[in-house]
């Protein structure tokens, strides 16, 4: 790991994010999956630049049974009328309710990384 990466990690105060970034980078190298390296790079940025995606945007831009990854937080504004699998760093309580009511699943980034090591078929939402 380069010196620049270590500086970015030491600025993070949330130990979960630090370990997630390291795990993502390791998985990107082991599985030759550039999606995990991209997500790690996005999470190294300041948290004020993390994605904040509403349910309404997910509803507009996805089809039934899509798998998406949000490098940030999923918020509960809007309605969801089809099942989707959403992985994110964090979810609001109302977002979890709406996704599960529509028949979808809420996963952490670690869980989707274990389920799909190559990252194929995953859409990144910003």
UniProtKB/Swiss-Prot annotation:
GO BP annotation list: translation
Assigned keywords, A-Z: Ribonucleoprotein, Ribosomal protein
Pfam families tied to this protein: Ribosomal_L27A (PF00828)
Cited PROSITE patterns: RIBOSOMAL_L18E
Top-rank lineage group of the source organism: Archaea
Coiled coil: none
Any one cellular-component term (Gene Ontology): cytosolic large ribosomal subunit
InterPro entries: Ribosomal_eL18, Ribosomal_eL18/eL18-A/B/_CS, Ribosomal_eL18_arc, Ribosomal_uL15/eL18, Ribosomal_uL15/eL18_sf, Ribosomal_uL15_CS
MF (Gene Ontology): RNA binding; structural constituent of ribosome
Family statement drawn from the similarity comment of this UniProt entry: Belongs to the eukaryotic ribosomal protein eL18 family.
The protein, known as: Large ribosomal subunit protein eL18
Organism: Methanosarcina mazei (strain ATCC BAA-159 / DSM 3647 / Goe1 / Go1 / JCM 11833 / OCM 88) (Methanosarcina frisia)
């Amino acid at each position: 790991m380069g010196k620049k990466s270590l500086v970015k990690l030491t600025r993070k105060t949330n130990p979960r994010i630090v370990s997630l970034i390291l795990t993502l980078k390791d998985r990107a190298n082991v599985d030759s999956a550039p999606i995990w390296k991209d997500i790690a790079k996005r999470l190294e940025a300041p948290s004020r630049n993390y994605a904040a995606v509403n349910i309404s945007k997910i509803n507009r831009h996805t089809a039934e049974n899509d798998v998406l990854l949000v490098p940030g937080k999923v918020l509960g504004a809007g309605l969801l009328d089809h099942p989707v699998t959403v992985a994110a760093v964090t979810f609001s309580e109302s977002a979890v309710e709406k996704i599960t009511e529509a028949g979808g699943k809420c996963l952490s980034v670690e869980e989707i990384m274990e389920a799909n090591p190559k990252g194929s078929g995953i859409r990144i939402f910003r």
